[in-house]
Amino acid sequence: MTADNNSMPHGAVSSYAKLVQNQTPEDILEEFPEIIPLQQRPNTRSSETSNDESGETCFSGHDEEQIKLMNENCIVLDWDDNAIGAGTKKVCHLMENIEKGLLHRAFSVFIFNEQGELLLQQRATEKITFPDLWTNTCCSHPLCIDDELGLKGKLDDKIKGAITAAVRKLDHELGIPEDETKTRGKFHFLNRIHYMAPSNEPWGEHEIDYILFYKINAKENLTVNPNVNEVRDFKWVSPNDLKTMFADPSYKFTPWFKIICENYLFNWWEQLDDLSEVENDRQIHRML
């Protein structure tokens, strides 16, 4: 499936979308001096700056392990999903920066078993952004390193980078061994979604999110052994189970998961046996 590179709902262009669209790479690097230009990036997973020693109030009361993870180097983007440089997870998730248009790359994985059930997780209480909320199997960020960046700049290379990051994070968050992920199923790239959402103060999200389905092979399973610092709970659900959860006010969901469900998920789910009509959409779907 192919399409134009950009899509806005109902043809609408918000003032925020215009702000992000009009920023050049030079504008981004000037506005955010913490961003390391792509050619000068250290090719390391994390910044050498220690959030633990910063004394910043934005981390007051938060879990030490989660604070360390805020040093990870995310991929800072322009409007067209071109990598501009490396920015720490902290810098990329502060609302004061997001309000100025700072954008980064992310991925969202949806794992389905042989019965067509989707693996959901409830984010741990310790998470700095969107704690305790239910969401899809795994949501995180490719890092600004060679294996996850897509150095050639082509979409297929970026997809490979997102999948490499997904394999890493499925192990880190859910304890799914990397060798199992690589051999017991297959990833399918669906599309990219561009959205912005505030979290708890002072945090938020502004991402181009690579949507990845993963179908477990027939008669096989994946080991799920969650990292309690990342995942509070998990469950396998059918479409009807998920709709029941949405109708129950005791369940709270991440904003990106709600966007994906409201616009795409249930239609995609119906085509799970043959995703050829819906996968590999080259368009960036703007939800701003």
From Swiss-Prot:
Pathway the protein contributes to: Isoprenoid biosynthesis; dimethylallyl diphosphate biosynthesis; dimethylallyl diphosphate from isopentenyl diphosphate: step 1/1
Sequence positions that bind substrate: K89, R123, K127, S140
Active site per UniProt: C139, E207
Organism: Saccharomyces cerevisiae (strain ATCC 204508 / S288c) (Baker's yeast)
The record's free-text note on cofactor binding: Binds 1 Mg(2+) ion per subunit.
Location in the cell: Cytoplasm
Domain of life, source organism: Eukaryota
Catalysis performed (reactions): isopentenyl diphosphate = dimethylallyl diphosphate
Keywords, comma-separated and alphabetical: Cytoplasm, Isomerase, Isoprene biosynthesis, Lipid biosynthesis, Lipid metabolism, Magnesium, Metal-binding, Phosphoprotein, Steroid biosynthesis, Steroid metabolism, Sterol biosynthesis, Sterol metabolism
Stretch list, region Disordered: 33-58
Other facts noted in the record for this chain: Present with 25500 molecules/cell in log phase SD medium.
Domain Nudix hydrolase: 102-259
Chain sites annotated for binding Mg(2+): H93, H104, E205, E207
PROSITE patterns listed in its UniProt record: NUDIX
Membrane-traversing stretches: none
Enzyme nomenclature, EC number: 5.3.3.2
Activity regulation summary: 3,4-epoxy-l-butenyl diphosphate and 3-(fluoromethyl)-3-butenyl diphosphate (FIPP) act as specific active site-directed inhibitors of IP Pisomerase.
Pfam families given in the database record: NUDIX
Function: Isopentenyl-diphosphate delta-isomerase; part of the second module of ergosterol biosynthesis pathway that includes the middle steps of the pathway. IDI1 catalyzes the 1,3-allylic rearrangement of isopentenyl (IPP) to its highly electrophilic allylic isomer, dimethylallyl diphosphate (DMAPP). The second module is carried out in the vacuole and involves the formation of farnesyl diphosphate, which is also an important intermediate in the biosynthesis of ubiquinone, dolichol, heme and prenylated proteins.
Family assignment from sequence similarity: Belongs to the IPP isomerase type 1 family.
GO annotation terms (biological process): dimethylallyl diphosphate biosynthetic process; ergosterol biosynthetic process; farnesyl diphosphate biosynthetic process; isopentenyl diphosphate biosynthetic process
Identification of the protein by name: Isopentenyl-diphosphate delta-isomerase
GO CC entries: cytoplasm; cytosol; nucleus; vacuole
Requisite cofactors: Mg(2+)
